[in-house]
Structure formats: structure tokens, C-alpha cells
């Protein structure tokens, strides 16, 4: 029987689900943490998520739970896909469950914490009190639904530790998703922030243009 390493994805929104699919298609056994029981049940039983990824079939190696302890138990890598302004409070619940492990902690989030101005990797380091070499960030020109439909794309995995970055990149590679590594965590995170700002600006420009036609 093929052994699949377990990874946990904390947050079952569109990007968390999409990255969970990437990981499962790359050979991992993926356990999602979802806040709502009905969402966890749909992912586990129907292999669907009609709210965030309508029409997408999820891999059979993806399941979901509302229990953080169950999701994190035995996870060899932990991926965080939580709204950036809610990260700190959610990490407080995660901390006691990852304190005794050395599993890499991977941020899938873009943005900075408004109250402190800290980047997501800095919030993770501050709350979890973990070695920054254990933290990685993932970023790229990615749209969740396009990737969920398996349109070929790529991302960058950054960590102060090349070993951590490469371990995460290996886990997240599959036939339609390629991951490249670097150690420029700051540049990778701010690149993701700027990408979001440009996307919002372009959307606003299109809306204003349509109103003047």
C-alpha cells in the first residue's frame, strides 16, 4: 500500500481548498480544518465544496474536520489559509498543538496585520514562538478556481531555511503546479501584497470605465 504523508491545511476557503487539492494531487493525505460542520462534511463525504469551488471534484485523499487537534495530529507540514486579520487569534489555538513538533508552518496568506504592520510570517513567529527557519511562505500569480481546474501554473516557496523551502516545494509539486524556492521571505510576501493591490486597482478601473461608457 502506498504511504502518503499527512499534511494539515487550516482554513477551508477557496484558496485553502485549492492548495489542499494541490497537495493531495502531489501525493499527500490532506486534512482540512473547517470552522463549519456542514462544510467539513461536504468535503469529506461528497468530495465537493459547492460554496467556494463549485463544480470541482476534490481528491479522495482530502478530508475535513472541525477539530484542530484532529487536523494537526501527526501532520508533517501545516499550511495556514486564514483571513489575515484573524490569523493571530487562530494561531493562539494552534500553538499548543504544534509546540511539540518540528513540522514546517507554511503561510498561504497575503497581507499585513493592520494593528501591527507585521507580515504574516512575522505574526506566525511572534505567536508560535518558533524558529523562523521553520516558517515558509507561498506566493504567486495564482487564481484559485483556475488552479482547481488544473490549469498549469507555478508559485514561489520562500523560507530563511533552504531546506524548509525545498521540503515544502517538493510536497506541493504535481502535474499542473510547479513550485520554485528562494530565501527572500520579505520580497515574496510584499510581492503578494502588491499583487493584491494591483488586482483591486484594475478591478476598480474596469468598474469606473463601465460606468462612463
Summary of predicted features, one role per range:
Residues 3-56, 64-66, 93:
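NAD(P)+-binding Rossmann beta1-loop-alpha1 motif at the extreme N-terminus of oxidoreductases
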Residues 86, 97, 123, 127-131, ...:
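Internal alpha-helical scaffold of NAD(P)-dependent oxidoreductase catalytic cores
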Residues 65-73, 77-152, 168-170:
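Rossmann-like NAD(P)(H) cofactor-binding subdomain of soluble oxidoreductases
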Residues 7, 29-30, 133-135, 179:
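Hydrophobic anchor at the start of a short beta-strand
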Residues 54-63, 101, 131-134, 175-177:
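A short helix-to-beta-strand connector/capping loop
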Residues 1-2, 207-213:
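Single conserved hydrophobic/aromatic residue that forms the stacking wall/gate
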Amino acid at each position: 500500500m502506498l504511504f502518503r504523508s499527512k499534511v494539515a491545511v487550516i482554513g477551508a476557503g477557496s484558496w485553502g481548498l485549492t492548495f489542499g487539492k494541490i497537495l493531495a494531487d502531489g501525493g499527500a493525505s490532506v486534512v482540512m480544518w473547517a470552522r463549519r460542520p456542514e462544510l467539513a462534511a461536504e468535503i469529506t463525504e461528497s468530495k465537493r465544496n459547492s460554496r467556494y469551488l463549485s463544480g470541482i471534484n476534490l481528491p479522495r485523499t482530502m478530508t475535513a474536520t472541525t477539530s484542530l487537534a484532529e487536523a494537526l495530529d501527526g501532520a508533517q507540514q501545516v499550511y495556514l489559509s486564514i483571513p489575515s486579520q484573524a490569523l493571530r487569534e487562530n494561531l493562539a489555538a494552534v500553538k499548543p498543538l504544534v509546540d511539540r513538533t518540528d513540522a514546517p508552518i507554511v503561510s498561504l496568506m497575503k497581507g499585513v496585520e493592520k494593528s501591527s504592520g507585521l507580515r504574516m510570517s512575522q505574526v506566525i513567529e511572534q505567536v508560535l514562538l518558533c524558529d523562523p527557519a521553520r516558517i515558509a511562505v507561498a506566493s504567486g500569480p495564482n487564481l484559485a478556481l483556475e488552479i482547481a481546474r488544473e490549469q498549469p501554473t507555478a508559485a514561489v516557496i520562500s523560507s530563511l531555511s533552504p531546506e524548509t523551502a525545498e521540503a515544502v516545494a517538493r510536497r506541493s509539486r504535481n502535474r499542473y503546479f510547479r513550485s520554485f524556492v528562494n530565501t527572500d521571505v520579505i520580497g515574496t510576501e510584499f510581492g503578494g501584497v502588491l499583487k493584491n493591490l494591483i488586482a483591486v486597482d484594475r478591478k476598480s478601473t474596469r468598474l469606473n470605465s463601465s460606468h462612463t461608457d
